[in-house]
Amino acid sequence: MANTANKPNDLVKEDYDLIVIGSGCAGLTCAIQARELGLKPVILEKMETFGGNSMRASSGMNASETIVQLKHGIVEDWHDFYEETYKGGGKLNDPELLEYFASHGALAIDWLAAHGIVLDDLTITGGMSKMRTHRPKSLAPIGAFLVNNLMKRAKELEIPVVCGVKAERLLTDEKGAVCGVKTAQRNVYAKAVVLATGGFTASKDLIAKYRTDLKAYRTTNHAGATGDGIKLAEEVGAEVMQMDLVQVHPTVQQDTDHVYLIGEAVRGEGAVLVDGNGKRFVNELSTRRIVSGAITALKEKSAYLVFDSQVKKRVKAVDFYQKQGLVVEAKTLEELAKKLNVKENDLEQTLEKWNQAVEKKQDSEFGRKTGMERELNQAPYYAIHIAPAIHYTMGGLHIDKQTHVLDKSGNVISGLFACGEVCGGLHGNNRIGGNSISETIIFGRQAGMRAAAEIKK
């Protein structure tokens, strides 16, 4: 989809009902929901193109108790989703945020479907026991699919999305309520502001401040993920939380100048990880924290994702990876082993043992229980060299379940809301794959609804 966003000189109005800062899935969802409730919002985006970090999301959107799951024969309770996310986050998740999140996923899927954005295929990600990761039937990467479709709806609703405008400061009135944004072009006023600016994975200063041990790590995120919303909110007294909780994603291709995240759906559809000897070393669908730690513990501190043509067909993102030259392809396992410079017999034995585990539905080596729907036995065979990289910041602004930003005393900062990765507390010390996109839609809607309700009082 072409970039249909406005440019700074198109920002002719000085006031709106609602200013949304950030044009990823959270910001777009928030603005659409607010507009449909009668507000006149504007979206300000500092980058020259819309979509933010959401454009890089690949695997899908987690939700439980959905119609889609029932069509696939999956019956479950959202409380199980809650418990697995809570466990996956080291039980450091904010229970109130997590309960709202886990119990509103199906509504978010339905809301998207009502807007013609249908996610009717399922896969699974690490840390989940059931297929909850919703994606389009085309198997297209979730991020660009959602952003482009949400942008279409924003255009239909005549919501201005203005790129190239950086928020320099939040404006407050005499009572301390947030009432607008200072930009290089002008002051823009509104009855409320929503921060949907993403995390700080691309901020060397903030990473160095909160996680010195990760200073040398590369990031999967785009250059705009610099924690702007956190800084803006702190200037008006907002509290931050869990800022040291930074996620390292285990499967990132880093052999070129550009860093490429290899989505969790590749493992969810059956790929295995092997070390430099061609042997498995971990349950590939453990949490990202565990898998990253296992890779880092290897002598080479990297590994290979190995899969076959069946997995490739189930994950369309692999076509993109191939176009970028990231995928090693071979007609046989023997040929693949030679290309990877691993022992042929070891790789063949690894796949033979894995296929037996799939057939028996029992992984006696590492206890993997998911992503075992099909054996890896259909040539051609493929491999991608991966290593861990910074991927997500679980910490951020302290919000309540109504998406109000809170100050250091736990009080609501009037007129200020936040949604998406800019917020802390939801994920604990490890974000489950597929939960970030869910967060953007669930809490993006919530921010739009709450802002509309309070502005209309």
Q: In which residue ranges do the predicted regions lie?
A:
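Conserved N-terminal/central alpha/beta ligand/cofactor-binding core
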Residues: A5-D10, K40, K46-P160, G164-R169, ...
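Extreme N-terminal leader/targeting segments of oxidoreductases
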Residues: M1-L18, E36, G424-L426, N430, ...
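N-terminal Rossmann-like FAD-binding beta1-loop-alpha1 element of flavoenzymes
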Residues: L18-I43
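An anion/pyrophosphate-binding glycine-rich loop and adjacent beta-alpha core
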Residues: I230-L232, V236-D346
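Internal hydrophobic alpha-helix adjacent to the cofactor/substrate pocket in enzyme cavities
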Residues: L232-E239, E348, T440-K457
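Glycine-rich loop(s) and the adjacent beta-strand/alpha-helix scaffold that form part
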Residues: V188-V252, Q446
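Core beta-strand elements of the Rossmann-like FAD/NAD(P) dinucleotide-binding domain
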Residues: K13-Y16, A184-A192
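A glycine-rich dinucleotide-binding beta-alpha-beta segment and adjacent secondary-structure elements
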Residues: R169, D346-N430
